[in-house]
Structures are given as structure tokens and as C-alpha cells.
Amino acid sequence: VGDIIAPLIGANPGEVSMHQNVSLLQAMLISCFQFTGQRNKVVYSDMEFPSVTYVYDQFARERGARIHFIQSEDGVTVPLERMLAAIDDQTLLVPISHVLFRSSYIQTAKAIIEKAHAVGATVILDAYHSVGTMPVDVKDLNVDILVGGVLKWLCGGPGGAFLYVRPDLREKLTPVITGWMAHPRPFEFEVGKMEYRTDAFRFLN
């Protein structure tokens, strides 16, 4: 199924894995990062989908994250200049929506990604409301991580969330939230120390 999704986001076959929902995806992604150093800041706005903000407020903060919360001034947009100013050399993660669920406002994702990369931060782009409504190209955006789902504009059912991780970043991320399908030999049912696949399926659980 991931290979069916891949061309919709400009990804190659084998680069997209399927998951239960975006909230669990975000929790799994958070588990890949350490928030104990000076680079522990997470930047997002009050226009994000509540379920995602709950995951960051509870799970990421519990792991040591410092949340920088940007408030919309009009309930429609997130000021780009404030977002860019908030992303600094202490920023670890920038989890943002491509299209805001409340207002359909399209964020300038490429500029945010470029600023994040300039200071060494990682962007998790939620494309739930953009895939199926507008062109999305992970290569052109040079996005680190993209999540989304088929429930809305791809006219699918529940349980169809998807994940893209930039190939050069993939093996640098080791999720603590994991499972047997992320093992390189899942059907050998080996008990003991976890080993991770090197492909997109290393993020399965």
C-alpha cells in the first residue's frame, strides 16, 4: 500500500510505510529523539490538530522537551516570520501541518524546512490535509519526515496513516516504540536484543 501512496507525495517505491494513525506515528517519531541536551526545543502552533499537540505536550515534554508554542493572531494563519524566528540552534523538532485543519491555510513549508535545516533541526510535516488536494513532493520540499493519512482527501478508511522518512536520515533514527515487524527477520520470531531493518519498515511496530 505504501508504494501506492508514494507517487502521490513524490516518493520512490519502498520509501513509504503504513501505520495505524498519525498520533501514534508522532509518538513513535518522538521516541527516536533525545531531549536531554541544550537542543531540546520543539516549535509548533496552536493551529495544529489537538491530538498531535497532546502527544507532544505529554510524551515529548515527559522526555525533556521544551515546547515553544506559537499562537495564531487571527485563528486562520500562523505568521511565517514568527515561526522562522522561533526556530533557532536550540530547536530539535518542528512538527507542523502543511495545510491547517481549522482554516485550510497553506503554510510555507519549504521556507520553514530551509530555516530548520540551517540550524540543524528536523521537520515533521503533517500532510494529512494537503495530499489529495494539492501537489506534494517530498524531494522538492527536502522534508525530513512526512506523515499523513487516507481518511480525508484520499477517500480511504481509518487505519491508513503513512510515513515517509528521507532515506539519508532513516538509519539515524531508532524508535523506542517498536515491534516485531521492524525486525529484519520478523518471521524467525527471535527473542532478545532488538535489531532494526534499514528500509522504511524499520518504523513499523
Give the residues covered by each predicted segment:
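Pyridoxal 5′-phosphate
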Residues: 1-205
